[in-house]
Amino acid sequence: ILQRVRIHVLPLINPVGMLNGTRANGRGVDLMRNAPIDSQEKTILLAGGHRISSYLPWYRGKAGELMQPEAIALCNFIAQEVLPAPFSLVLDCHSGFGFRNQIWFPYARSRLEPIKHLKEVYYLRKLFMQTYPHQDYLFEPQSQHYLTHGDLWDFLYSQSLESRNVFLPLTLEMGSWRWIRKNPLQLRQLLGLYHPIKPHRLNRVLRSHLILMEFLLHATLSYENWLNKSDAQELEQQALAMWYP
């Protein structure tokens, strides 16, 4: 497989934030709200991204400033190593939103505008559901949950449209709230809202997503086969009916 598919692993984008136990980087900026892209629709208060103060979470940074060094590093890496490929998938792994495992795709900025490759994502979802009918993932646009300004994957996906290559960025939200029911005492620390905390539970969470990662690897390997099948017009109509009624 590795003779035909390249795998890049970026284990950590925000080391200072990880060290400090915060979403923000060392300058108080939330990297996932830092891209120069704005929602024209109503975003969730504060959590959708704001420019009020770095003392508040989800701070975007000052208007007109360059992106933060970590965000620039990620964008440069994607532009140089990923976007030139005829087909590429990204899985951005996040801990802590909801009780279910969720796979999100752009846009985070709009409930009204679907991405150009909607039918391709829909067919990828269909393949996953057919291959693993008993999986526990909710697969849908991020905008089904909330809207944000400055989403890095919205920005990078928009950049990818300048070429004919297909770039599908996915975000895995691991349903870590379920672990609160197992161990309510972990809420005594902020990390407990987003993290299983106990080592054996953390290992179980990580193991549970290996099937998804293997599926995405094989989907990338055979992309030409299923991309051709995803070109049917009725697939786009089905996707619109499901996600943008």
Tell where the protein language model's regions lie, with residue ranges.
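Structured catalytic-domain cores with a bias toward divalent-metal coordination
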Residues: 1-245
